[in-house]
Design a protein with these regions (language model features):
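Hydrophobic positions within alpha-helical transmembrane segments of bacterial inner-membrane proteins
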Residues: 10-22, 26, 107, 140, ...
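Transmembrane-helix boundary motif in ABC transporter permease subunits
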Residues: 11-44, 118-119, 137, 207, ...
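Loop-to-helix entry region at the N-terminal start of transmembrane alpha-helices
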Residues: 2-6, 73-102, 144, 149, ...
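C-terminal transmembrane helix and the adjacent membrane-cytosol boundary/short C-terminal tail
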Residues: 108-119, 123, 190-221
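Periplasmic/extracellular loop-to-transmembrane helix junction in inner-membrane transport proteins
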Residues: 1-15, 183-186
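Membrane-interfacial helix termini and adjacent extracytoplasmic/periplasmic loops
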Residues: 55-96, 130, 166-170
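Glycine-rich helix-loop "coupling/hinge" segments at transmembrane-helix boundaries
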Residues: 60, 160-188
Length: 221
């Protein structure tokens, strides 16, 4: 169903933004203080442009004659253009690009407070990089991970513009279905029911965040 599809795409988008945003935020937090503002400025640049324009920029890159296919063809990795546009993959790529700053900024806020002496102590005790990441860094930046995940999951679940442009109207999400019921379908009762269901899911996600934030705060206290 469209609801399950929307949940899957939103969760996968959240995971992708976390995988990209985590090393990005760590990189920024380890830069000299004078250059951090510059890197944060680059991260926030997309917010200065309209959502539709940002989505159209991705469309140009992943279309059959776009940058991705052109590079892969010239490198001989593929023989014919890949059909990325108008697929779930295109929607995930688009939403990951659009919502990435919402993941990076909370992660950076947590990583900025990291005591890097703990990381150095871990290496002094011959801990491997993955052990340092798993046992030191992740527990300390968990609040930022949770906050970023919620900030990405909620808007991606109700996304309308990005699925419409990159999905081509064939791969609908909840937001598209709601618009269809209120617009062309003229089925306002169903549209209202879908909207309320979406609000319940969003409230549940917020409740999870509040509970985790409370536990984290209690743990630090």
């Amino acid at each position: 169903s469209i609801f399950l599809r929307s949940l899957k795409l939103s969760l996968m988008t959240t995971v992708l933004t976390l995988l990209v945003g985590f090393p990005t935020a760590y990189f920024i937090s380890t830069r000299p203080e004078k250059t951090r503002e510059f890197w944060l400025f680059l991260i926030t640049i997309p917010f200065w442009t309209n959502l539709l324009i940002r989505t159209l920029a991705i469309l140009v890159i992943i279309r059959n004659e776009g940058l991705v296919n052109t590079i892969l063809l010239k490198l001989g990795i593929i023989d014919a253009p890949m059909q990325i546009l108008f697929t779930d993959t295109a929607i995930m790529i688009g939403m990951t690009y659009v919502y990435l700053p919402l993941m990076v900024l909370p992660l950076y806020a947590s990583m900025e407070k990291l005591d890097f002496r703990l990381i150095e102590a871990g290496y002094d005790l011959y801990a491997k990089p993955m052990q340092v990441l798993r046992k030191i860094i992740i527990p300390l930046v968990k609040p930022g991970m949770i906050a970023g995940s919620i900030l990405v999951f909620i808007p991606s679940l109700g996304a309308y513009v990005t699925p419409s442009v990159l999905g081509g109207g064939k791969n609908m999400m909840i937001g598209n279905l709601i618009e269809l019921q209120f617009g062309q379908g003229r089925n306002w009762p169903l549209g209202s029911a879908l909207s309320i269901t979406l609000m319940i899911i969003v409230m549940a996600a917020l409740l999870v965040y509040v509970r985790n934030a409370s536990k984290t705060g209690a743990g630090h206290g």
